[in-house]
Amino acid sequence: QPDPNAFYGLM
């Protein structure tokens, strides 16, 4: 499962 931090780093 992809970690939420990776998503925030993209923003």
UniProtKB/Swiss-Prot annotation:
GO terms for cellular component: extracellular region. Pfam families: Tachykinin. The keyword Secreted applies. Expressed by the skin glands. It is found in: Secreted. The modification Pyrrolidone carboxylic acid is found at Q1. GO terms for biological process: defense response; neuropeptide signaling pathway; tachykinin receptor signaling pathway. The modification Methionine amide is found at M11. Its main location: secreted. Keywords: Amidation, Amphibian defense peptide, Neuropeptide, Pyrrolidone carboxylic acid, Secreted. Tachykinins are active peptides which excite neurons, evoke behavioral responses, are potent vasodilators and secretagogues, and contract (directly or indirectly) many smooth muscles. Belongs to the tachykinin family. This is Uperolein.
